[in-house]
A protein has these predicted regions:
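Short, well-ordered alpha-helical segments enriched in acidic and aromatic residues
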Residues: 13-30, 39
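Short beta-strand edge/turn micro-motifs at domain boundaries
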Residues: 88-113
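Residues that flank catalytic or metal-binding motifs in active/ligand-binding sites
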Residues: 23-25, 56, 91
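Surface-exposed, charged secondary-structure patches
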Residues: 44-85
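Short, aromatic-enriched amphipathic alpha-helices that serve as compact interaction elements
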Residues: 1-14, 22
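Short beta-strand segments enriched in hydrophobic/aromatic residues
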Residues: 23, 74-76, 108-111
Length: 113
């Protein structure tokens, strides 16, 4: 949960360099707009205002000593390009430990109905 909070705080505060440090070179994000690489995710960060967020139902499964998946629900107050994107979303992040550092390889985000 600490990693998810740290990477989300970097996104919220538009800290592109710090945000990128949490992403593997082959990082992909999947959301309603499609599949994005790290550069596209950072471009989205620049046009997003995330004023508040909270996590719920966080579960982390250790798939191997170097792979873990975090699944959770996140509720946001946010806009993207001036459009209200607030709501509740289901999310998952696949993390890979490289050396002493965990990096996000894949992140998915789907708005709850």
């Amino acid at each position: 949960m600490k990693l998810e909070k740290s990477v989300t705080d970097a996104f919220k505060n538009k800290q592109a360099k710090l945000f990128r440090e949490y992403l593997a070179p082959e990082f992909s994000a999947i959301d309603v707009e499609g599949v994005k690489d790290a550069d596209a995710e950072i471009a989205d960060m620049e046009k997003t205002d995330l004023s508040n967020y909270s996590f719920a139902d966080m579960k982390v499964a250790l798939l191997s000593p170097k792979m873990a998946v975090a699944t959770y629900k996140v509720t946001t107050q946010s806009t993207s390009s001036g459009r209200d994107t607030s709501g509740t979303y289901y999310a998952a992040t696949l993390w890979n430990k490289r050396g002493a550092k965990w990096l996000a390889v894949l992140h998915t985000l789907v708005k709850a109905q």
